């Protein structure tokens, strides 16, 4: 058997894809208006203010309801405060209310378990906080279509983060989103970018997502082969089927836009040797974590009608990564805003 070609190695999006490829191709709707001497009002400001208000309600919930034993409520609240800061970035200080100050119980005992995550046992207080987290996630998803590309990407990431918080608080995971069929508005006779609102950058991002799903399907074949016949292998089969469905969805959508879907490579180079069940579990977590970045970029690249599909795919990958033992990320799929120097304006 010949070794994988250079094309094969480069096509392994999950293992070698750089997260900035699509982000660099998208632009927001801000900047000076023609003929104006200064920046025009940020059209994302109303969306940001709504998201900040929803986050403030959640912070107040953490100050009112105690976290259950074994859950780091203070840590979840601190992450939520970081979400608020990211959402308020760029808003005039006079337009943003002061954030809630911690006054009530949020601290539970820090988690002591390691390995694949398990949910806390539901309690009345847990249900209250978890419901607030899920409500905040839904509010962010509801505003995807009203946001500019970068803000939509952030909202999708935060919706996934709040769903992870709800899982940590004991809420059952939401049902996995069913991959939709290709939009009827795009016909097979169309050329790339000819369908309403779909340009070349969006088609490129869809091809990247398709390539990543090809790699995930291959990767889960390796995962399943290294796991014993137990619930973990059942989880791997379920994930394998989910990624096949996503792959098929992107193939249909790309075809409907008049482009040729990228084929799967003959083989893929794994990020590390997979010789045991522990290695297989680690690979599954790696696959899902890498996919969150792919789908965050897709949210920013596609037009509004397709953003929710990409955002739900991001959420599902984040939940599966957690199930496989990956640590929860404060900003799934996107760089931590606190680690990125803020741009200055003159």
Question: Residue locations for each model-derived region?
Answer:
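All-alpha RGS (Regulator of G-protein Signaling) helical domain and cognate RGS-like helical scaffolds
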Residues: 2-346
């Amino acid at each position: 058997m010949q070794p994988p070609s250079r094309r094969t190695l480069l096509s392994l999006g999950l293992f070698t894809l750089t997260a900035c490829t699509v982000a660099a191709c998208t632009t927001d709707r801000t900047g000076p208006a023609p003929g104006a001497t200064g920046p025009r009002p940020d059209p994302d400001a109303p969306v940001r203010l709504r998201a900040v208000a929803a986050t403030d309600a959640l912070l107040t919930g953490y100050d009112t309801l105690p976290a259950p034993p074994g859950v780091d409520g203070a840590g979840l609240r601190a992450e939520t405060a970081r979400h608020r800061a990211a959402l308020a970035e760029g808003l005039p200080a006079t337009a943003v209310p002061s954030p809630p100050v911690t006054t009530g119980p949020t601290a539970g005992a820090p988690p002591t378990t390691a390995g694949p995550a398990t949910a806390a046992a539901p309690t009345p207080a847990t249900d209250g906080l978890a419901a607030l987290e899920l409500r905040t996630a839904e509010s962010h998803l509801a505003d995807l279509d009203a946001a500019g590309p970068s803000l939509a990407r952030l909202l999708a990431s935060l919706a996934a983060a709040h769903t992870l918080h709800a899982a940590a608080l004991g809420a059952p995971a939401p049902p996995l989103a069913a991959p939709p069929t290709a939009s009827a508005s795009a016909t097979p006779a169309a050329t790339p970018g000819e369908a309403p609102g779909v340009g070349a950058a969006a088609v490129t991002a869809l091809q990247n997502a398709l390539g990543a799903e090809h790699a995930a399907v291959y990767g889960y074949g390796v995962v399943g082969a290294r796991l014993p016949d137990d619930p973990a292998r059942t989880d791997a089969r379920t994930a394998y089927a989910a990624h096949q469905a996503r792959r098929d969805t992107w193939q249909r959508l790309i075809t409907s836009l008049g482009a040729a879907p990228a084929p799967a490579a003959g083989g893929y180079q794994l990020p590390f040797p997979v010789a045991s069940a522990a290695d297989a579990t680690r690979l599954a977590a790696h696959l899902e974590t890498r996919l969150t970045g792919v789908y965050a970029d897709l949210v920013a690249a596609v037009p509004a009608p397709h953003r929710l599909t990409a955002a739900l795919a991001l959420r599902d990958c984040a939940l599966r990564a957690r199930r496989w033992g990956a640590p929860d990320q404060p900003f799934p799929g996107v760089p931590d805003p606190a680690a990125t120097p803020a741009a200055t304006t003159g």
